[in-house]
Amino acid sequence: MNKELVLVVDFGGQYNQLIARRVRENRVYCEIVPYTTSIEDIKEKAPKGIIFTGGPNSVYGENAPRVQKELFDLGIPVLGICYGDQLMAHSLEGEVTSPEKREYGKTDVNLDNSSLLFKDMKEKDQCWMSHTDYISKVPKGFKIIATTDECPCAAMENAEKKLYGVQFHPEVEHTLFGKKMLKNFLFNVCNLKGDWTMSSFAEQQIKAIKEKVGNKKVICALSGGVDSSVAAVIVHKAIGKQLTCIFVDHGLLRKDEGDQVEKIFKDQFDMNLIRVNAQDRFLGKLKGVSDPERKRKIIGEEFIRVFEEEAKKLGDISFLVQGTIYPDIVESGTNTSATIKSHHNVGGLPEDMEFKLIEPLRELFKDEVRAVGEELGIPHKLVWRQPFPGPGLAIRVLGEVTEEKLAITREADAIFREEIAKAGLEEKIWQYFACLPNIQSVGVMGDERTYCHTIALRAVTSSDAMTSDWARIPYEVLDKVSRRIVNEVKEVNRIVYDVTSKPPATIEWE
């Protein structure tokens, strides 16, 4: 696709995805690549700008990440952040020092607003620092353009070569001028147009899919979630009835979800849809299994088996559509980030699979997927449907999965979702659900002692699922949810609310 590109070079920093999000907020496409990416690969990608992320290392560390010095002579603007700033100075023969005192948290910074980087900004503002080492001598051709009381070089520039470095983190909210500074880098330094929109993305994807597929047949694994739904519609717009969607109902869906999926895609979108009722098969495979990773793998493998069986019945199929999105790729592990969970879309595909993959959304964060869905005319309610994991309720029922536990979780979850909708909070909360933590506790109902299940409610705010905070749901809403669940769902006598952010917790419990 012909689009302007910024590369975010990953040095292992905790804010890498946030940097990418900040760039994309300016309608500029960017990709995160490992620091080991070769000069040849960078030249081939032809980025209009490069951003070095922060990272946990010191430039003097034995195994500290490095880049080839030639990168700074490519004529491509570079912005180094924190470790990226220090690495730029070190690579170009400046000096980096380790002081006795580190600088961490909100800090007042003095800015030279004659620099393009700080154009139209105040001379003094607030930034967020998180570093031990700092630049004590800038490289030849550079000048200092920002200072703090503790850091003699809070930012530097070589305006002629368009090389910039900042010791602080412009991507976080605590740097009050950070978004404006990144905008200056993108538009005043890199001279980008900012013309990457979701409508142009959809048009380009539809055109590319048409060219790739030709007159061949395509199948799509449809779950009814936002990602697979948008992926299916974008491919259907490209090739129409050449696409057949297979909906594997594994019996691990939310209340009435299977029927809703069938109705929307068969009736409303007029797609070729095959629904496979495989509940007994999946529950049989999960019998006696309580380890969450084993559950994920079993469901992923069985899903593929069922899917392949159905695909064979269709005859000559060349392509498989998947709703993989960018966080799936990032969280499933790169050179600089550990695997957090086995993602249902990324892991578990058999090596001998005969289909070629079509992943139209693999470049997008979740909020961008929703925007594409709106552009494609998908109903608002479906586009804003709750994120739902591939393994379904199997990872919201902690421990062994049984029909009884699924029924309890399904009913409690339906009540929670219903009350959130009644309170008008559906689109204010990123994700909300009930789970069964495999805990029983003593209670009293009427005059009798009970020993029943506990339901945990989880609700988070986020924009892309990379980080999240627990949602501050009004007490009166939580009270109503709690009273309804203990009165309407058998075998439940206690409700708890999860008040943990991500990190340290993940959004799902398993």
UniProtKB/Swiss-Prot annotation:
Pathway: Purine metabolism; GMP biosynthesis; GMP from XMP (L-Gln route): step 1/1. Homodimer. InterPro entries: Class_I_gatase-like, GATASE, GMP_synth_C, GMP_synth_GATase, GMP_synthase, GMPS_ATP_PPase_dom, NAD/GMP_synthase, Rossmann-like_a/b/a_fold. Gene3D superfamilies: 3.30.300.10, 3.40.50.880, HUPs. Residues 5-195 form the Glutamine amidotransferase type-1 domain. Its EC number is 6.3.5.2. One of its GO terms (molecular function) is ATP binding. It catalyses: XMP + L-glutamine + ATP + H2O = GMP + L-glutamate + AMP + diphosphate + 2 H(+). ATP binds at S223, G224, G225, V226, D227, S228, S229. This is GMP synthase [glutamine-hydrolyzing]. The lineage of its organism: Bacteria, Bacillati, Bacillota, Clostridia, Eubacteriales. The keyword Cell cycle does not apply. Residues 196-385 form the GMPS ATP-PPase domain. The active site is at C82 (nucleophile), H169, E171. Keywords: ATP-binding, Glutamine amidotransferase, GMP biosynthesis, Ligase, Nucleotide-binding, Purine biosynthesis. Catalyzes the synthesis of GMP from XMP. The keyword Nucleotide-binding applies. One of its GO terms (cellular component) is cytosol. PANTHER family: GMP SYNTHASE [GLUTAMINE-HYDROLYZING] (PTHR11922:SF2), GMP SYNTHASE-RELATED (PTHR11922).
